[in-house]
């Protein structure tokens, strides 16, 4: 933990655009309240989803920057995350269930299609949306996808957390109460995301992890190879939970994709200019009018008069 906090303190702070309760909205899906926030207006719609057990706050600076460039960006908290409801039944949580929540959000907003994207859990949810409702996906932003190469890293990282949330819940709740007392006003973005992660109730957190472990993590390879939506895949080195090999594998599977290498897992939240520009340009390209294929004009052949017959 000291190492992680040291890394967070070492990176330059990014201006935090906080969401007030008045800005955030909710819709009801299967009896549960799902939280979302709209940033900007226009026809270039993009939905951004957070990482595992974090919240939509991690995407607020990116959403604000994209909105300034003419996009309508919707940040969403899936069930069990952020300001959405947090039931304790594990059967409510899976990547495919989160994909259905995204489609329900689009229905609620009367949006026929959108660019969908997110980090880690958000990236895998995006793949599930593309598998279940490809007509609703204009493009995919896939930051840190978690596929076959991440199996061991995920087991090592999240099994101890799941056990702690299940069998040491009082200790976890105590840590959460301490985190809730930290004033957020001068906390940089990465610090605020970390505090949100610590502050959460362990009971629904454990249910989320158990539900995700029980169901599939992402669409299988044969389904991924059938996806036609353009994709921007962002990977980074030195991360066993989000290995760059998974990003490379996905790039080879998706025929209409581009692979972008981030300098580190922190780049988009600490030095976001380069990646924000790439993402904004990608969304613009996804919404650009498609050029109609023009049929080649038939060549006109000069009609020749028949030669006059000799008298």
Identify the meaning behind each predicted range:
Residues 127, 131-132, 138-167:
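Flexible "cap/lid" loop of the alpha/beta hydrolase fold
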Residues 227, 233-235:
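Short beta-strand/loop motif that positions the catalytic acidic residue
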Residues 193-222:
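Hydrophobic, aromatic-rich cap/lid helix
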Residues 118, 122, 126:
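Gly/Ala-rich beta-loop-alpha elbow adjacent to hydrolase catalytic centers
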Residues 78-117:
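Active-site loop/oxyanion-hole signature of alpha/beta-hydrolase fold enzymes
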Residues 32-85:
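Conserved HGGG/HGGXW glycine-rich cap/lid loop of the alpha/beta-hydrolase fold
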Residues 240-246:
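Conserved alpha/beta-hydrolase "acid-adjacent" motif
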Residues 257-311:
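Catalytic active-site module of serine/aspartate enzymes centered on a nucleophile-bearing elbow/loop
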């Amino acid at each position: 933990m000291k190492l992680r906090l040291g890394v967070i303190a070492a990176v330059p702070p990014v201006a935090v655009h906080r969401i007030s309760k008045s800005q955030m909205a909710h819709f009801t899906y299967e009896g549960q309240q799902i939280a979302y926030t709209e940033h900007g207006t226009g026809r270039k719609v993009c939905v951004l989803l957070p990482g595992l057990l974090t919240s939509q706050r991690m995407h607020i600076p990116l959403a604000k920057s994209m909105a300034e460039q003419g996009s309508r960006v919707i940040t969403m908290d899936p069930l069990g995350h952020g300001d959405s409801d947090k039931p304790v039944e594990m059967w409510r949580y899976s990547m495919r269930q989160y994909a259905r929540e995204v489609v329900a959000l689009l229905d609620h907003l009367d949006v026929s299609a959108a660019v969908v994207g997110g980090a880690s859990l958000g990236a895998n949810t995006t793949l599930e949306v593309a598998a279940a409702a490809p007509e609703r996906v204009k493009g995919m932003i896939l930051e840190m996808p978690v596929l076959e190469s991440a199996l061991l890293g995920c087991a090592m990282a999240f099994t101890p957390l799941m056990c702690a949330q299940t069998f040491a819940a009082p200790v976890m709740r105590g840590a959460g109460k301490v985190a809730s007392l930290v004033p957020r006003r001068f906390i940089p973005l990465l610090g605020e995301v970390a505090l949100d992660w610590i502050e959460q109730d362990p009971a629904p957190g454990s249910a989320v992890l158990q539900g995700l472990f029980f169901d599939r993590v992402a669409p299988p390879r044969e389904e991924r190879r059938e996806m036609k939506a353009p994709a921007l895949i962002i990977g980074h080195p030195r991360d066993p939970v989000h290995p760059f090999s998974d990003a490379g594998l996905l790039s080879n599977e998706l025929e209409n994709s581009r692979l972008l290498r981030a300098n580190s897992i922190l780049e988009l939240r600490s030095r976001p200019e380069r990646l924000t520009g790439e993402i904004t340009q990608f969304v613009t390209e996804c919404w650009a009018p498609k050029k109609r294929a023009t049929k080649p004009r038939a060549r006109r052949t000069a009609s020749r008069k028949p030669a006059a017959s000799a008298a």
